[in-house]
């Protein structure tokens, strides 16, 4: 179903069970096929490929040569019906690739809302990308990666499969992430190492001074005081009641399968 207010270029090809909502525009030579829904006000520019099952929310901007909903690059993938779900107000720049999930995991690749995905970003199968994230040019996520809200993954930085990039963290350019990055932490290098707290980012997002100081103490407990991970957990846990923002550290420690960058 194509809404009467949608603007579809004559050279675009649309086939299958496609729903295009009000005020969507589809540019020349774009190909949309399968069980695809494109939400109100989304702009799909020229030469884009969108395949199903894929659901895209409202007011997104999708630039030329982006490919969304293609099969995963997992050798175990056998054509199963898996999905991509994308939220609202994302900017998806040229040649970004977002692949469908696999039945070996969640079966869905998800991207939240208000993200900036720069040129040539790759988001592999079963990734979970939150809200308000920036991924620089040629940043890549292998399968099963989680990137939490407000994280920044700078240009040319790959993230190993099953890793988590914590909320409000900052990955420097051309870094290689092979273990989990705790929330609020700045990290860089090959392999990626911690080098402080993303204080400027926290100030911009309205964190209180007391919260930032508590986050710095948690960072010192984890990296500067010679503690084991278990000892750091104990120190951080002492401040959870006064500073619930620290819960993100403990949540990551609990679910980590790759280990924490050290």
UniProtKB/Swiss-Prot annotation:
Its main location: cytoplasm. It comes from the Bacteria. Keywords: Acyltransferase, Cytoplasm, Lipid A biosynthesis, Lipid biosynthesis, Lipid metabolism, Repeat, Transferase. The keyword Repeat applies. Its EC number is 2.3.1.129. It is an enzyme of class 2 (transferase). GO terms for cellular component: cytoplasm; membrane. It catalyses: a (3R)-hydroxyacyl-[ACP] + UDP-N-acetyl-alpha-D-glucosamine = a UDP-3-O-[(3R)-3-hydroxyacyl]-N-acetyl-alpha-D-glucosamine + holo-[ACP]. Pathway: Glycolipid biosynthesis; lipid IV(A) biosynthesis; lipid IV(A) from (3R)-3-hydroxytetradecanoyl-[acyl-carrier-protein] and UDP-N-acetyl-alpha-D-glucosamine: step 1/6. The keyword Lipid metabolism applies. GO terms for biological process: lipid A biosynthetic process. GO terms for molecular function: acyl-[acyl-carrier-protein]-UDP-N-acetylglucosamine O-acyltransferase activity. SUPFAM superfamilies: Trimeric LpxA-like enzymes (SSF51161). It holds the Pfam family Hexapep. It is found in: Cytoplasm. Involved in the biosynthesis of lipid A, a phosphorylated glycolipid that anchors the lipopolysaccharide to the outer membrane of the cell. Belongs to the transferase hexapeptide repeat family. LpxA subfamily. Homotrimer. This is Acyl-[acyl-carrier-protein]--UDP-N-acetylglucosamine O-acyltransferase. It comes from Aliivibrio fischeri (strain ATCC 700601 / ES114) (Vibrio fischeri). The lineage of its organism: Bacteria, Pseudomonadati, Pseudomonadota, Gammaproteobacteria, Vibrionales.
């Amino acid at each position: 179903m194509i809404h009467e207010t949608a603007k579809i270029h004559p050279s675009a090809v649309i086939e299958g069970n496609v729903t295009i909502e009000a005020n969507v525009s589809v540019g020349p030579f774009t190909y949309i096929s399968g069980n695809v829904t494109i939400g109100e006000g989304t702009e799909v520019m020229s030469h884009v490929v969108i395949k199903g099952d894929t659901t895209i929310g409202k007011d997104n901007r999708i630039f030329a040569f982006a490919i969304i909903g293609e099969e995963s690059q997992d050798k175990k993938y056998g054509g199963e019906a898996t999905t991509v779900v994308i939220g609202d107000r994302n900017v998806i720049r040229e040649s970004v690739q977002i692949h469908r999930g696999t039945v070996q995991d969640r079966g869905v690749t998800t991207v939240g809302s208000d993200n900036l995905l720069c040129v040539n970003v790759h988001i592999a199968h079963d990734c979970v990308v939150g809200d308000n994230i920036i991924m620089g040019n040629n940043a890549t996520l292998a399968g099963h990666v989680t990137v939490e809200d407000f994280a920044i993954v700078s240009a040319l930085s790959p993230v190993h499969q099953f890793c988590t990039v914590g909320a409000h963290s900052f990955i420097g350019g051309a870094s290689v992430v092979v273990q989990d990055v705790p929330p609020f932490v700045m990290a860089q290098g090959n392999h990626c190492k911690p080098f402080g707290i993303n204080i400027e980012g926290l100030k911009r997002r309205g964190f209180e001074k007391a919260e930032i100081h508590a986050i710095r103490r948690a960072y010192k407990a984890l990296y500067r005081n010679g503690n084991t991970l278990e000892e750091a957990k104990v120190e951080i846990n002492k401040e959870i009641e006064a500073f619930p923002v620290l819960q993100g550290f403990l949540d990551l420690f609990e679910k980590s399968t790759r280990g924490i960058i050290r």
